[in-house]
Amino acid sequence: KTAYEIHERLVGSEMCIRDRRSGAIVERKKLNQWFFNISKFSEELLQGLESLDNWPNKVKVMQKNWIGKSFGCEVEFKVESNKPIKNIKCYTTRPDTLFGFSFLALSVDHPLAKHYEDDKEFQKFKEECSKTGTTEESIASAEKLGFKTDLVAINPLDKNMKVPVYFANFVLMDYGLGAVFGCPAHDQRDLDFAKKYNLKITPVVKPEKDKDFEINNEAYTGEGYLYNSDFLDGLKVPSESIVKTIEFLEKNNLGTKKTNYRLKDWGISRQRYWGCPIPMAYDENDQPIKIPRDML
């Protein structure tokens, strides 16, 4: 998606509400573009940083964060619905907090959005989401908004735990699978969302094993021990809890261990007329043709 203002000028993603020059509302529109598939080389790029002896360490740290390697689990949630939807998959780095699960949130660009194309309220919500930026800063500062669907997701660790499914303005399609499970007690964004829509808040991690603990206005994101988590109670967080939860999910065909990267493909379509041309042409049927190397 690309950010435009009313005069059809391309603007930066950080200009998420109004263009600083014209004052016009910024919207995000889908646009066919060309990309270099650098995400395919995420691990190679990450390992290559180790050979850059003369680079400042802070620059290498920035590059590592940009590539954003993470370890987690792809979890499958069964869905109750009157639509032809059987399950929803989501990637998470914290499967150990599943017993604190109180909602499932989808990007408005998620494939399941096609089932709501005729819903006028959803289309209004989707248009509103297009005004939200895609940077971490703009998402963090924006009001958390949701569109409640008629879907109900089932917790894979407890079949009796059923929660609502929302489309939400803070979920992006280009990270993970465009779906996140909400654990309000241990993620501030999820907590803000849960309070806005009066959703259940169940803490499942406490800093000390034998002391009472509760969540008020701030999510707890530190280390500790699992509780309110049935057979996972007492596991040390995160050193034991994540591994043990993934082992259980894999053993019962409920999830798969996964390595993920934040690095996106490199968009090269925004070319000036004096820049290097993209070596592609189109035939009379608008089909792309690669320009032979000997013609470049």
Where are these regions (language model features)?
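Amphipathic alpha-helical
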Residues: 38-70, 101, 107-146, 295-296
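Short, exposed "boundary/linker" segments that immediately precede the start
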Residues: 2-6
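A short catalytic or substrate-binding loop motif that flags glycine-/basic-rich loops and adjacent residues
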Residues: 67-71, 95-97, 142-148, 154-157, ...
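Catalytic alpha/beta core of large soluble enzyme barrels
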Residues: 110-208, 213-214, 218-219
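Structured, non-catalytic alpha/beta "coupling" segments that mediate domain-domain communication
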Residues: 95-115, 272-287
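Residue patterns forming the tRNA-binding/recognition surfaces of aminoacyl-tRNA synthetases
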Residues: 1, 13-14, 18-88, 179-295
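Auxiliary tRNA-acceptor-end handling modules of aminoacyl-tRNA synthetases
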Residues: 91-93
